[in-house]
Amino acid sequence: MLLKPEPIHFDEVYQNFEKYLKDIYGNYSESFSFNDIHSLVYKIIIAKMDINHEEPEKPFKIQFGEKITMFLDNCTREICQNIIKEKDIIKAYSNQWDLYYSSSETGDKVCRYYNRTLHYQNYTSFKPKLVKTFFVLSLEKWKENVIFNLKNNYDNILVKQILESIDNERNNGTPTNEYIIKVIESFVKVIVKTDKYESGIVYGHTQQLYEDEFETPYLANIRDYYKKESESLINSITIEEYVSRALTRIDKEVQRCRYLCKPTSYQKVIDVCKEQLIIQYKQKLLDKFEELLSNKQYEDCTNMYKLLSIVKDGINSLAAIYEDYITKYGFKECKKLGNIKLK
């Protein structure tokens, strides 16, 4: 590797670099040398003069950043077009994401020297400033040209197919599309924050995009689904059947949440289920409890306890009814004793 800057023909050197980059993102079988690619990047970044021994109007590092930005922009736009051609958008997105993410990790490694120098040089006369590593830039382009493009220009087809798959599982027991979990994970991985340490750049992730693009519509989907179902069931089946159905629904929704969602979504899902399946009909459920006690329907009483224990003051409300029932029952039994004196 060169240790001193040498004059370069930028376009020629960059084209050689981009050829390797296309191989990386195309998942081609051709082998390549990591050192060869890294040397090309290093040669560009340290160069001060062009082939004519003149300073370029724009530093080569800036030109390099613009070129890789254009490459990633074109790459992600092409990927989105390939995804939209498929019938199963979820599967197509998942497969493309796996390849793109691993390719971006590799691309980030070969651009390691470029990444390191971003924090050491400041070309104040050029906007925007270079502050994004190759990896961060690649994921931002995925967010912009794939996720947001599918949302804004294709009727949010990706998330719609996910919610349709989940509804199909609720209605028919059809297993949820196995690729959904990868799509959801991508909403977290695609937002990257960087921290710089002496040993290098460390990447972390945030959940804001996940919350905005998946969690919010998912919670709305749960709310709408169970609002409609509870309104239909509460007046068409017995309270005992409703309680049993609600317990099953909540249990399955919790399992689905643990499989698909991030841990921060768990309580939110529970709260939506409680509101639609329990809280709206709490008084109607409580009104039935004393009758269940009187009829010695103890299994149904247990189910009622399990369901109402999920909501605030549910147990206290049941306890008050039970206490009143015991008082009435005891008084009734005592009356049967007549005037018998108790020793």
Regions found by a protein language model. Give the residues of each.
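Eukaryotic scaffold/interaction segments
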Residues: M1-K343
